[in-house]
């Protein structure tokens, strides 16, 4: 029997674009859940299988999901209501939805949580731009979609992509604030904090400036480690989160990041996401590229920096057919952001297939 093409060629995935709206958080969640019910249930079940393969029992991942959802309710009741609506609309209980929404936090229960994303940015007045690869299991290559979210009163419309069941992930809002995500790892990581994907959703919906986004991130009691890169037309700020502590990285011109801590003040307890991580090799590849690169004329100029030769298993990553299908990692999407031009482009697969 032939394998589904996405297991070896994620760029061939037909990505759905959906418009999500509702009169309140819960109603918007219900609308999302009903519209995408089958895919939301499939994604939740896929994460349950992943956790089982990693040795996380059903009771443990459910307890972790509930703890993270409780933290989300304390931090932002509206987002908790939206998550409850998504679950109801999709025919899941809330803890089952939490296996997706809090999957980053749940994976802190294993010694080698995978995720190998690479981000490149350029800061200049009126023309800051950013791009990233999103690397994940090839088995989840069909578990994400583009979206356009209609704002509630006091919110901003936003566009980008998310996984089925999450209200937000990576994107750009109508105020010109964008956000990227890279996973980091620290010895104190654990489940139970606000899910980082809930934080991303709030930034996209509510942040009117880069400074507001940074303060939202710093206000969230997260228990896992991540890099959240906030992009506006005039500035780029990378926020490293180490299980509750934060550090900011910012400078004019080029700034790149992969999956290990760069801030000196967060080195105590810093770890690789996986002993086999390529984070240092990918950072070196990006730094070599920006070393001779002129200021970008547009976000398309960032794409070549991400286009490492696929056979190198570096920034641009194809599934390894020699590995078991469920273990294959790959670049599932490439994201380009240009806040000044109100542009966010999300394309499936390695950056070689991204629009210039």
Region locations from a protein language model:
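C-terminus-biased signal that marks the final domain/tail of proteins
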Residues: 1-116, 206-227, 232-238, 242-243, ...
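Internal mixed beta-strand/loop scaffold within catalytic domains of large alpha/beta enzymes
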Residues: 102-194, 198, 332-335, 344-346, ...
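Short, well-ordered beta-strand elements within core beta-sheets of diverse protein domains
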Residues: 201-205
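Acidic, Ser/Thr-rich peripheral helices and adjacent loops at domain boundaries
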Residues: 246-253
